[in-house]
UniProtKB/Swiss-Prot annotation:
Residue positions binding Mg(2+): 72, 140
UniProt-recorded name of the protein: CTP synthase
Domain Glutamine amidotransferase type-1: 291-542
Catalytic activity: UTP + L-glutamine + ATP + H2O = CTP + L-glutamate + ADP + phosphate + 2 H(+); L-glutamine + H2O = L-glutamate + NH4(+); UTP + NH4(+) + ATP = CTP + ADP + phosphate + 2 H(+)
Lineage: Bacteria, Pseudomonadati, Pseudomonadota, Gammaproteobacteria, Enterobacterales
Family to which the UniProt record says this protein belongs: Belongs to the CTP synthase family.
Activity regulation, short description: Allosterically activated by GTP, when glutamine is the substrate; GTP has no effect on the reaction when ammonia is the substrate. The allosteric effector GTP functions by stabilizing the protein conformation that binds the tetrahedral intermediate(s) formed during glutamine hydrolysis. Inhibited by the product CTP, via allosteric rather than competitive inhibition.
GO cellular component: cytosol
């Protein structure tokens, strides 16, 4: 089986939407029956984004196999059926780390280790490994052509195109075509200079995707084709749209998939985009709207919650309602009070780390519980809901997490290495013990209680969801909380760890330790988000009576 590669680069400015363009093209090719995957090569020196600030980098997307990756992999999974893994994302830091380990082991037999060939060879090896078993692999290069950080990756893909043969390699370059209101026309010069920069590295683009706030006229596309040495039919206009899910249809309408299949000599049927047409129809024709408050600590950069925001929109699609998301800083709840939570149809508290804003989240969970407002807590959102219930219902004054108050009287949430048994002895666990280390990452099984709301929502007794956390519900203090009325609706496959809690005498109060947003897609949605948005819609109707 021969694997074909499409290398995706960006020019002029960053944030042009290379990830969306690559994912949209992959969706079209998948709709033609091809086995497609996407890779992201990030030029930063961090080994992975796991320890990077969400405010600076955006969310960390967790794959099934537990890799902490770039948020673009979330876009990839929302557009195609193929699941991403740690083989789909690697960074400069990871490449250099691997090469340096080999050098220390003597794998290079005393050779002088250099960017070329050692770093570029390592990059090529990982691209080829990630592409095994697929018809087409799209490889997105992070950053912008001209950045010094990207040079080893660009050199590697230049070499790789020669290695595998140009008949199996395409270079697709995204570039900005700005509109100047004063001149009343779009300008192609930035694109010409961007392609010139790419040519200086030794890469001739085969396809140009022209990003603009409007459709790029045919005469301007012809001009770009002439000056950039690209066929006119390979100069594609990608204008701004009100929904990213319109991009596959936009690219297909200009024959991009036909051009690629012809270049790769792929004989495959026409793409059937009916599923995407249905998504677009549902998005454009809602029967109502709801307002959901998301109370977090990284709200100045919405991309920090990208998958949650998208999952809420997917929940809206499944209920034919538009979801308006109100981002609320949890510190504002602390300083201004819960009054700022009024007029919401539902409340969601997403994941997070650190003490800042936690008391505001706890107050938010209490407000939702006491006022019968639909509540969905994710990761930390479950932990604060548990702390709130322990304090205000179970009589455990000052209950907390050891993440925030290490010596609290009631550590209802703690590292699994900090649990104490019924005799008060610290339970010692390590990365070699059955429960693993202190960080749970990736897909794990969860058993649902038969009498739970989530059992009805999922329609199954066993589910698999992705995790990213260090702290767990402290089982040694759980009995007192359950006796006060909290329901444990889901436990880990070994029945050891609390995965889902519910408040039974509440219209809709669900909190989970895992991250359901990572498996929500526009075509399929997710049971928790669909149920949550439905509850928000019902709450709105009750309030209107």
């Amino acid at each position: 089986m021969t694997t074909n590669y499409i290398f995706v680069t960006g020019g002029v400015v960053s944030s042009l939407g290379k990830g969306i363009a690559a994912a949209s093209l992959a969706a079209i090719l998948e709709a033609r029956g091809l086995n497609v995957t996407i890779m992201k090569l990030d030029p930063y020196i961090n080994v992975d984004p796991g320890t990077m600030s969400p405010i600076q980098h955006g969310e960390v997307f967790v794959t099934e196999d537990g890799a902490e990756t770039d948020l673009d992999l979330g876009h990839y999974e929302r557009f195609i059926r193929t699941k991403m893994s740690r083989r789909n994302n690697f960074t400069t830091g990871r490449i250099y780390s691997d090469v340096l380990r080999k050098e220390r082991r003597g794998d290079y037999l005393g050779a002088t280790v250099q960017v070329i060939p050692h770093i570029t060879n390592a990059i090529k090896e990982r691209v080829l490994e990630g592409g095994e078993g697929h018809d087409v692999v799209l490889v997105e290069i992070g950053g912008t052509v001209g950045d010094i950080e990207s040079l080893p990756f660009l050199e590697a893909i230049r070499q790789l195109a020669v290695d595998i043969g140009r008949e199996h390699a395409l270079f697709m370059h995204l570039t900005l075509v700005p509109y100047l209101a004063a001149a009343g026309e779009v300008k192609t010069k930035p694109t010409q200079h961007s392609v010139k920069e790419l040519l200086s590295i030794g890469i001739q683009p085969d396809i140009l995707i022209c990003r603009s706030d409007r459709a790029v006229p045919a005469n301007e596309r012809a001009k770009i084709a002439l000056f950039c040495n690209v066929p006119e039919k390979a100069v594609i206009s990608m204008k701004d749209v009100d929904s990213i899910y319109k991009i596959p249809g936009l690219l297909k309408s200009q024959g991009l998939d036909d051009y690629i299949c012809k270049r790769f000599s792929l004989n495959c049927p026409e793409a059937n985009l009916s599923e995407w047409e249905q998504v677009i129809y549902e998005e454009a024709n809602p029967a109502g709207e709801v307002t959901i408050g998301m109370v977090g600590k990284y709200i100045e950069l919405p991309d920090a919650y990208k998958s949650v925001i998208e999952a809420l929109k997917h929940g809206g699609l499944k209920n034919r309602v538009t979801v308006n998301i109100k981002l609320i800083d949890s510190q504002d709840v602390e300083t201004r009070g819960v009054e700022i939570l009024k007029d919401l149809d539902a409340i969601l508290i997403p994941g997070g780390f650190g003490y800042r804003g936690v008391e505001g989240k706890i107050a938010t969970a209490r407000y939702a519980r006491e006022n019968n407002i639909p509540y969905l807590g994710i990761c930390l959102g479950m932990q604060v809901a548990l702390i709130e219930f322990a304090r205000n219902v179970a009589g455990m004054d000052n209950a907390n997490s050891t993440e925030f108050v290490p010596d609290c009287k009631y550590p209802v949430v703690a590292l699994i290495t900090e649990w104490r048994d019924e005799d008060g002895n610290v339970e010692v666990r390590s990365e070699k013990s059955d429960l693993g280390g202190t960080m749970r990452l990736g897909a794990q099984q969860c058993q649902l209680s038969d009498d739970s709301l989530v059992r009805q929502l999922y329609g199954a007794s066993t589910i698999v969801e992705r995790h990213r956390h260090r702290y767990e519900v402290n089982n040694m203090l759980l009995k007192q909380i359950e006796a006060a009325g909290l329901r444990v609706a889901g436990r880990s496959g070994d029945d050891q760890l609390v995965e889902i809690i519910e408040v039974p005498n509440h219209p809709w109060f669900v909190a989970c330790q895992f991250h359901p947003e990572f498996t929500s897609t526009p075509r399929d949605g997710h049971p928790l988000f669909a149920g949550f948005v439905k509850a928000a819609n019902e709450h709105q109707k009750r309030q209107a009576k």
